[in-house]
Amino acid sequence: MATWMNINLQDANSSTMEQLTMFHDHTLMILTMITSIVTFIMVSMTTNTLINRYLLEGQTIEFIWTTIPAITLIFIALPSLHLLYLIDEINNPEMTLKVIGHQWYWSYEYSDFKNIEFDSYMKPTNELMNNEFRLLEVDNRVLLPMNKQIRILITAADVLHSWAIPSLGVKIDATPGRLNQGSIKINRPGILFGQCSEICGANHSFMPIVIESVPIKNFLKWINKSLSS
């Protein structure tokens, strides 16, 4: 999760987020090189007193400063396109989670099992335990099994919302009258935090998302307990 004074990306909990982190580092390296070269050229131009009165054109240098940016853009575009198609792919999901955005809470349905659905509201400050986080904790967490391909179907009941979990590298828009889908595969157990990422009204800031990733045995126990109750 995001922590105080943290300027880095959150720890990746899915292969998608790992790929996004590597692409971020790849792009940042290229930008650092460009910034360094441009800074060096600007400093050289301001400090160099030499001139060339006979320079009318330079075909070679024009070819270089046209070709190098084109090659640089290719090195950025290819991994970017690869990631875009990778995020859109949904390969043989093992279960489906339905998400419905409301003002200002989330509803969840486990459509592979009967009668498992609930609403998830943010916990008010006066109900928080000592180990819970303000504005991020909810009354009903979403339990999901780790190392399983999960399809997310998402829509909204009123206005635009967006279901986002930064550590999973997922952000899916919830649009009224439209069903969007995405895919996640959590690769470690733990508690993952997210928030609504589309301004949806006065209480937009109070729509947290909490996912609890557990081993498949614990998940099945929770399913059986929910069905029996």
UniProtKB/Swiss-Prot annotation:
Its main location: mitochondrion. Cu cation A1 binds at H161, C196, C200, M207. Its cofactor is Cu cation. Residues 49-62 are mitochondrial matrix. Gene3D superfamilies: 1.10.287.90, Cupredoxins - blue copper proteins. GO terms for molecular function: copper ion binding; cytochrome-c oxidase activity. It holds the Pfam family COX2_TM. It is found in: Mitochondrion inner membrane. It comes from the Eukaryota. It is a multi-pass membrane protein. Cu cation A2 binds at C196, E198, C200, H204. Its EC number is 7.1.1.9. InterPro entries: CcO_II, CcO_II-like_C, CcO_II_C, Copper_CuA, Cupredoxin, Cyt_c_oxidase_su2, Cyt_c_oxidase_su2_TM_dom, Cyt_c_oxidase_su2_TM_sf. PANTHER family: CYTOCHROME C OXIDASE SUBUNIT 2, CYTOCHROME C OXIDASE, SUBUNIT II. Component of the cytochrome c oxidase, the last enzyme in the mitochondrial electron transport chain which drives oxidative phosphorylation. The respiratory chain contains 3 multisubunit complexes succinate dehydrogenase (complex II, CII), ubiquinol-cytochrome c oxidoreductase (cytochrome b-c1 complex, complex III, CIII) and cytochrome c oxidase (complex IV, CIV), that cooperate to transfer electrons derived from NADH and succinate to molecular oxygen, creating an electrochemical gradient over the inner membrane that drives transmembrane transport and the ATP synthase. This is Cytochrome c oxidase subunit 2. It comes from Oncopeltus fasciatus.
